[in-house]
């Protein structure tokens, strides 16, 4: 009982300080940063599985553009606690936020304007595995622990049989440290905008968000501070063309070799209505909307915030945002 209580208290103590967001994307080892990510307004979780925020988080900012991806290639999603901080010195998602990592895709007509209401199919999951030496679920192997081991990175195979077109890719980490009561599970997700090229014709079965999860699902309403004999990852099964990772497995590929500033990078074309928009009055001016990036290390975009907001360093020197 004492061990359980201390573990629970430790998890609760880390609750407020260890929120996180998926931010950057690598495509076959090429660093696209956050250019095609709809960055959430904050690093706080979504807890209501019946809200539309369960699709792509609450009030995400428009992405700069769409990342080009070939069907059958590997993308690597990257999570960190603070906006713009891609350092490996801190856990990607700390505070004993243990749980699975899942990735979904949705075929859309235009990734820049899609609202996430179309169907989703799961292409990846890294869930749970028993630690024979552990005494509770906290001691077991989890997808979020793998994120922490791999500097926030998780490799995801894009199914080779997908047809060409625009897609949303939804990366999600589920923290279960307070999931012992209904509404306690914490969902951290970001949607990335992709343009996929391929010759496939697959049409995977889909689920809807909201709708795919229930607050009482066994993988959502669960006490991980007690010993676990099994765990069911929420949502549908992974599509046959996707991939899985066994919790506790070693970092591979880009998870272990990709490092910010030491490899190839790429820039995407700016989508209409994204981060920087023309300011009235001409003169080549631009305006950054509230909650969007306006500065930071390596940033070369617009720095003029829309009326009513100012450019503030939220994670110096990496990231500044209009607030």
UniProtKB/Swiss-Prot annotation:
Residue numbers binding O2: 177, 186
Catalytic activity, reaction form: [(1->4)-beta-D-glucosyl]n+m + reduced acceptor + O2 = 4-dehydro-beta-D-glucosyl-[(1->4)-beta-D-glucosyl]n-1 + [(1->4)-beta-D-glucosyl]m + acceptor + H2O
Cofactor field: Cu(2+)
Organism per entry: Thermothelomyces thermophilus (strain ATCC 42464 / BCRC 31852 / DSM 1799)
Record GO cellular component, one term: extracellular region
Protein name in the entry: AA9 family lytic polysaccharide monooxygenase B
Presence of keyword Nucleotide-binding: no
Main location: secreted
GO molecular function: cellulose binding; metal ion binding; monooxygenase activity
Biotechnology: Lignocellulose is the most abundant polymeric composite on Earth and is a recalcitrant but promising renewable substrate for industrial biotechnology applications. Together with cellobiose dehydrogenases (CDHs) an enzymatic system capable of oxidative cellulose cleavage is formed, which increases the efficiency of cellulases and put LPMOs at focus of biofuel research. Concerted enzymatic process involving the initial conversion of monophenols into diphenols by the polyphenol oxidase PPO7 leads to up to 75-fold improvement in LPMO9B-driven cellulose degradation.
Subcellular localization, as worded in the UniProt entry: Secreted
InterPro entries the record matches: AA9 (IPR049892), AA9_LPMO (IPR005103), CBD_sf (IPR035971), Cellulose-bd_dom_fun (IPR000254)
Residues the record lists as binding Cu(2+): 19, 97, 188
Entry-linked Gene3D superfamilies: 2.70.50.70
Gene: LPMO9B
Family affiliation: Belongs to the polysaccharide monooxygenase AA9 family.
Cofactor note: Binds 1 copper ion per subunit.
Domain remarks: Has a modular structure: an endo-beta-1,4-glucanase catalytic module at the N-terminus, a linker rich in serines and threonines, and a C-terminal carbohydrate-binding module (CBM). The genes for catalytic modules and CBMs seem to have evolved separately and have been linked by gene fusion.
């Amino acid at each position: 009982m004492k061990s359980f209580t201390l573990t629970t208290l430790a998890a609760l103590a880390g609750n407020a300080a260890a929120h996180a967001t998926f931010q950057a994307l690598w495509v076959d080892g090429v660093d696209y940063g956050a250019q095609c990510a709809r960055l959430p307004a904050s690093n706080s979780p979504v807890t209501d599985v019946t809200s539309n925020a369960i699709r792509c988080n609450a009030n995400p900012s428009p992405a700069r553009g769409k990342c080009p991806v070939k069907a059958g290639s590997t993308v690597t999603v990257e999570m960190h606690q603070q906006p713009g901080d891609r350092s490996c010195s801190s856990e990607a998602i700390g505070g004993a936020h243990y749980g699975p990592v899942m990735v979904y895709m949705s075929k859309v007509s235009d990734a820049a304007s899609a609202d996430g209401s179309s169907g989703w199919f799961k292409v990846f999951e890294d869930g749970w595995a028993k630690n024979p030496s552990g005494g509770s679920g906290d001691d077991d192997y989890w997808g979020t622990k793998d994120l922490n081991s791999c500097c926030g990175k998780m490799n995801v195979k894009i199914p080779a049989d997908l047809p060409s077109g625009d897609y949303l890719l939804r990366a999600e980490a589920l923290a279960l440290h307070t999931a012992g009561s209904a509404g306690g599970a914490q969902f951290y997700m970001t949607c990335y905008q992709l343009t996929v090229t391929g010759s496939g014709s697959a049409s995977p079965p889909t689920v809807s968000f909201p709708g795919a999860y229930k607050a009482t699902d066994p993988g959502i309403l669960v006490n991980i501070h007690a010993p676990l004999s099994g765990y069911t990852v929420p949502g549908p099964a992974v599509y046959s063309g996707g991939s899985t990772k066994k919790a506790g497995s070693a970092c591979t590929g880009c998870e272990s070799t990709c490092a910010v500033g030491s490899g190839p990078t790429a820039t995407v074309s700016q989508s209409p209505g994204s981060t920087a928009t023309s300011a009235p009055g001409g003169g080549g001016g631009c305006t950054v909307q509230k909650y969007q990036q306006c500065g930071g290390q390596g940033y070369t975009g617009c720095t003029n915030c829309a009326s009513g907001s100012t450019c503030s360093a939220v994670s110096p020197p990496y990231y500044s945002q209009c607030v």
